[in-house]
Amino acid sequence: MASLIQVRDLLALRGRMEATQISHTLHAPQPMIDAMLNQLEIMGKAVRIPEEPDGCLSGSCKSCPEGKACLREWWALR
């Protein structure tokens, strides 16, 4: 079972990661990693980095049927 310290250490080693990458690396369920990242954010230890929509190749994310699912969210230590 992953701990907050393991999530923090992984972010320290890798710089920035997506929650799904952290989940796969630590072999932990995605909802648990999401909760841990939110807790680290509340504690002021981690920061959420949303991907900018200007990276969209077609430029039509607002009308995209995926609903901006192509935009990724990164996490990094503060």
Swiss-Prot record:
Residues engaged in binding iron-sulfur cluster: C56, C61, C64, C70
Gene Ontology MF terms: DNA binding; iron ion binding; iron-sulfur cluster binding
Keywords: DNA-binding, Iron, Iron-sulfur, Metal-binding, Repressor, Transcription, Transcription regulation
Taxonomy, superkingdom: Bacteria
Pfam families with a match to the protein in the record: FeoC
Family that this chain belongs to: Belongs to the FeoC family.
Protein name: Probable [Fe-S]-dependent transcriptional repressor
Organism, as annotated: Salmonella typhimurium (strain LT2 / SGSC1412 / ATCC 700720)
